[in-house]
């Protein structure tokens, strides 16, 4: 259908999120009406390729487009994601308690997960992550089974995703597993090793699947897909530019400071952060409970760590990468609940 064709064409030509296909075409359509001649100062369109991705989402997108339009595709995706969301919430309620189900629901609503099915590229990671949560919660799982599942999830994510919010497929199933009663009984520093090991396993599956596409695409097309992929890795992890600003850490921090200071928000936010840290320190139950909650704390830090490693990509595409913070909210709420108790503040004040 024409609208879908237009969107595909726009995506093909529009890499910069802050320009549109219309802006590019305007250079070629406009005339110098004073001279009656076509404009000759149009910038050249630089060709690019997405051959480094598997584009696995086409497995369900193309068949659906044979029987429906893009609206129908969205309806199917909404139904699938709603069913998976409900399944995760019900299983969390049944196996981990009402609080866990509420944490999950709140975290996903805060990042507008309900909007993800509107776009195929946003839908993929949420669907894969929720499916992983359902598998984890279906019955008690051993740590080695979970690590193997994370390997599979890494492969599936790499196959279907376009580097949107892949960390969700690692963190959400892992948090669901850590919240299960039998894992809470074993909670502690040992599980931190499982979190790290599971993350490495997921990363191996993710990277190997992705790299295999580079090799196969190069063999089939004769193009140097590996060089292009490695170049893109460098672009997304090194300092690039955004709105004319080089994305070094110094420039990023200076931009944040000047933006907040210009709105007289910097020092109030600093004060709020200091107060929150003081409240956190004063409300910690004890060191043992803090250690038991530490694996959940590590999961909460996965998304910030991902943003730091891929800072250029995360900032330039912040309009969709921010939804990965749903993992931080989910794991963070669980971490705070297990290691903190506001009643501890009153007890400590009485002692002083």
Model-derived segments and spans:
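Hydrophobic/aromatic-rich transmembrane helices and adjacent perimembrane loops
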Residues: 316-340
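Membrane-interface helix-loop-helix junctions at transmembrane boundaries of multi-pass membrane enzymes
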Residues: 278-301
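Juxtamembrane segments of multi-pass membrane glycosylation machinery
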Residues: 52, 59-77
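Interfacial juxtamembrane loops and adjacent helix segments
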Residues: 1-50
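Membrane-interface alpha helices of multi-pass inner-membrane proteins
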Residues: 146-174, 194-208
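Membrane-lumen/periplasm interface segments of specific transmembrane helices
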Residues: 195-276
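Aromatic- and kink-enriched transmembrane "portal" helix at the membrane-lumen/periplasm boundary
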Residues: 59, 105-128, 153-159
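Transmembrane-helix motifs of polytopic, lipid-linked glycan transferases
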Residues: 78-102
